[in-house]
Design a protein with these regions (language model features):
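Short glycine-rich anion-binding loops that position phosphate/pyrophosphate groups of nucleotides
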Residues: 63-65
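Conserved N-terminal substructure of TIR/SEFIR domains
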Residues: 1-61, 70, 79-89, 94-96
């Protein structure tokens, strides 16, 4: 994957889906839950795989994001990988945060 999209589900309609649509239009290969996960998949195993295989993590930071456990898990994983690999892999996008 080129990018792993980390976001809160409450931000899908207002920001995430339009971003994903544009990335798909550009031919970017992304890990995005609605495109990647299938019924019966192990959520944690698939998220871990996406986090490991993605070149970069796009993190949609919002008030919703900051209050979720799964998004914190994803962000922590990306930070750990960035520190371990000594590589700038996190691309933050501030969404509706002043």
């Amino acid at each position: 994957y080129d990018f792993f999209i980390s976001h809160a589900k409450e931000d899908k309609d207002t920001f995430v889906r339009p971003l994903v649509d544009e990335l798909n239009r550009l031919g970017v290969i992304i890990w995005y839950d609605e495109q990647t996960l299938e019924v019966g998949d192990s959520l944690r195993r698939n998220i871990d795989l996406g986090l490991r295989k993605a070149n970069y993590g796009i993190v949609i930071l919002s008030h919703n994001f900051l209050n979720k456990k799964w998004t914190q898990y994803e962000l922590d994983s990306l930070i750990n990988r960035a520190v371990y690999d000594d590589n700038k892999i996190i691309l933050p996008i501030w969404h509706n945060i002043n």
